[in-house]
């Protein structure tokens, strides 16, 4: 069936549509050659139409273990070519079969290069995937999409000797797995219930990734600041942005975001450059950072945006990139080790009211 990707400025791109005939969302692009299974199920992509830049997607199928959440989070997938005949010993579905199972539209044979050039030149915009480009209606994401992506109840993984509370704004499974692999017990706490950490009394806090505008979490910034002032904290992606906001900083939206597995980041402390996996639309405004409390630890090599912070007095650190990768390079996994070895030991006694 013929289908279209229609952008909010009226530009349309034709292709072949498989699945549900109509959906709307924010059109973004991912530049990685692999990792489509993790991308499709990453809660940070909640409500978005993902355009894959690599021309062939699905060649190794979909397996049962590399999901980042229990179901696809994207509104639709747009590719140049979807591979129907996958080749991998662990695969159980083709890309098309998996998306059909969840009624997620797949638009193929699209000139994805032209789509990306359009978004890159004009910025991220709302879009619809539809069987008819006439009269297409475009509805953007709700203001607080993290509310839809976070868990509804507290859960626990692992039984290690270090107890980490993972505050969930739409966390990736691989973040919890990375901590469990390092000997941690991980308790996932929905951000709406974050005050539960005072009863849990963990050794440390991790503020997770998540979708959408960090300012949509503004009503919780006071609680976030109180918690991270009492517990050693690591913020990842959205969690990093929330730490900056909690200490009086500001964030803004990039024209087309960082989404891929080859983003170079420099550590200002060691002068080392390493490749990172990233997925975000918003960044911290460097000019807004309170230099009396926070210092910039990492910068993006290409656009010099802020990629990580450290508190000057409290055991608090943050990164804009994804140290757990999945998908992407494992060069920054040491962030978890640094947090557990150097930040956690600085734990202060919880101040009881």
Swiss-Prot record:
Top-level EC class: ligase
Keywords, comma-separated and alphabetical: Amino-acid biosynthesis, Arginine biosynthesis, ATP-binding, Glutamine amidotransferase, Ligase, Nucleotide-binding
Function description: Small subunit of the glutamine-dependent carbamoyl phosphate synthetase (CPSase). CPSase catalyzes the formation of carbamoyl phosphate from the ammonia moiety of glutamine, carbonate, and phosphate donated by ATP, constituting the first step of the biosynthetic pathway leading to arginine and/or urea. The small subunit (glutamine amidotransferase) binds and cleaves glutamine to supply the large subunit with the substrate ammonia.
Domain of life the protein comes from: Bacteria
UniProt key word Nucleotide-binding: yes
Protein name in UniProt: Carbamoyl phosphate synthase arginine-specific small chain
Chain intervals for the UniProt region annotation (CPSase): 1-162
Glutamine amidotransferase type-1 domain residues: 163-349
Location of the active site: 237, 322, 324
Keyword Nucleotide-binding: yes
Family label: Belongs to the CarA family.
Subunit structure: Composed of two chains; the small (or glutamine) chain promotes the hydrolysis of glutamine to ammonia, which is used by the large (or ammonia) chain to synthesize carbamoyl phosphate. Tetramer of heterodimers (alpha,beta)4.
Record field: catalytic activity: hydrogencarbonate + L-glutamine + 2 ATP + H2O = carbamoyl phosphate + L-glutamate + 2 ADP + phosphate + 2 H(+)
UniProt-listed Enzyme Commission number(s): 6.3.5.5
Pathway recorded for this protein: Amino-acid biosynthesis; L-arginine biosynthesis; carbamoyl phosphate from bicarbonate: step 1/1
GO cellular component: carbamoyl-phosphate synthase complex; cytoplasm
One GO-annotated biological process of the protein: L-arginine biosynthetic process
InterPro entries: Anth_synth/Amidotransfase, CarbamoylP_synth_ssu, CarbamoylP_synth_ssu_N, CarbP_synth_ssu_N_sf, Class_I_gatase-like, CPSase_GATase1, GATASE
UniProt-recorded Gene Ontology molecular function terms: ATP binding; carbamoyl-phosphate synthase (glutamine-hydrolyzing) activity; glutaminase activity
Positions that bind L-glutamine: 44, 210, 212, 238, 241, 279, 282
């Amino acid at each position: 069936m013929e289908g279209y990707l229609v952008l909010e400025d009226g530009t349309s791109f034709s292709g072949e549509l498989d699945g549900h005939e109509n959906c709307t969302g924010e059109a973004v692009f991912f530049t990685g050659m692999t990792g489509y299974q993790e991308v499709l199920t990453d809660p940070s992509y909640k409500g978005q139409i993902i355009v894959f830049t690599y021309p062939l997607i699905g060649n190794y199928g979909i397996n049962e273990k590399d999901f980042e959440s229990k179901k696809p989070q994207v509104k639709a997938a747009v590719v140049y070519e979807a591979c129907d005949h996958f080749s991998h010993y662990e695969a159980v579905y083709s890309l098309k079969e998996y998306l059909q199972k969840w009624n997620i539209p797949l638009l193929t044979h699209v000139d994805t290069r032209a789509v990306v050039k359009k978004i890159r030149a004009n910025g991220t915009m709302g879009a619809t995937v539809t069987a008819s480009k006439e009269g297409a209606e475009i509805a953007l994401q709700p203001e607080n999409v993290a509310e839809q992506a976070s868990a509804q109840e507290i859960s626990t993984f692992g039984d290690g000797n270090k107890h980490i509370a993972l505050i969930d704004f739409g966390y990736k499974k691989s973040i919890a797995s990375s901590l469990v692999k390092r000997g941690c017990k991980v308790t996932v706490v929905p951000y709406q219930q974050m005050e539960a950490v005072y009863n849990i009394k963990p050794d440390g806090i991790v503020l997770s990734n998540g979708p959408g505008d960090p300012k949509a979490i503004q009503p919780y910034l006071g609680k976030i600041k109180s918690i991270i002032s009492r517990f050693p904290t690591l913020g990842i992606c959205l969690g990093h942005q929330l730490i900056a906001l909690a200490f009086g900083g500001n964030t803004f939206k990039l024209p087309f975001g960082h989404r891929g597995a080859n983003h170079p980041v420099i550590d200002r402390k060691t002068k080392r450059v390493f490749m990172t996996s990233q997925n975000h639309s918003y960044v911290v405004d460097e000019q807004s950072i309170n230099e009396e409390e926070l210092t910039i630890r990492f910068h993006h090599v290409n656009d010099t945006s802020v990629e990580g912070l450290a508190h000057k007095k409290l055991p608090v650190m943050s990164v804009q990139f994804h140290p757990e990768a999945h998908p992407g390079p494992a060069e920054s996994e040491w962030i978890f080790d640094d947090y557990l070895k150097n930040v956690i030991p600085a734990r202060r006694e919880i101040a009881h009211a």
